[in-house]
Amino acid sequence: MIVLNRLRLGTVVAFVALSLPSAHTLAQSAQPIPSPSAPALRQPPNVGDAKAAATAYHDSGEYGRDLAVVTSEAGAWIVQRGPQVSRPALVLDIDDTALTNWEVIKADDFGRIIGGPCDALPDGPCGWAAWDLLGKAPVIEPTLRVFQQARSLNVAVFFITGRPESQRLATEQNLRNVGYEGYAALHMVPEATHYASAAAFKAPVRAAIERDGYTIIASMGDQPSDLAGGHAEQPFLLPNPFYRIP
């Protein structure tokens, strides 16, 4: 019995020894188990990063260079097409097309603050309506050159803006002060009128200009909604990563 028990004990010990994992096996099992492939994150760009990138784009000169590219193309088209049409016309937006609002954009940290005063620039906040009434928006020089080029070729220039009619005097004064003189008309949103989008107002105005006998050979704006809806032979979209108008 004693021998038998010893044999059995030896068998058990041998079995246990064979069953225990080796040091190599233990080391392998200590490695982290790879997780299943996770789907790509779908979050949009970080707002703070986007604002920093937009500021760098403006201040580095890239914005100005891109403006020059688009306006040069517009000018070349007007020179080519203008003499071929009996009553050629150019349509221009105002805000961040003919005049720059960068001072307000920066002061408001890219917010779109419509109401309130604007009396602390370069600090904010600055209400856009109050800013428009100041009539101090600087010119966008490349657009002014296109305007002057068009006028030298007897191309009629029409401004169509989302600004309300109540800002007409300040807007006309601002345009005149920076060099936009001799345009055919300034179309503004009637008081107490709401449009679902900028295009809902601007496209019908362009259609009315055509009904008056003009051929709109070019339309230029900084928002896709400035150009949507047709009634222009060639649209020219200026860069604007700073805000979006539907």
Describe every region a protein language model picked out:
Residues 2-4, 24-92:
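Non-catalytic pre-domain segments flanking phosphatase-related domains
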Residues 10-21:
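Bacterial N-terminal signal peptides
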Residues 30-34, 40-41, 45, 61, ...:
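C-terminal cap/substrate-recognition subdomain and adjoining C-terminal extension
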Residues 63-70, 74, 139-146, 167, ...:
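Stable alpha-helical elements in mature extracytoplasmic
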Residues 73, 77-84, 97, 101, ...:
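Structured segments of extracytoplasmic/periplasmic soluble domains
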Residues 82-89, 98-137, 152:
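Active-site neighborhood of HAD-like aspartate-dependent phosphohydrolases
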Residues 91-93, 159, 220:
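Short hydrophobic beta-strand that contains or immediately precedes a catalytic carboxylate
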Residues 130-158, 165-166:
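Short, acidic loop-to-helix structural element flanking the phosphoryl-transfer center
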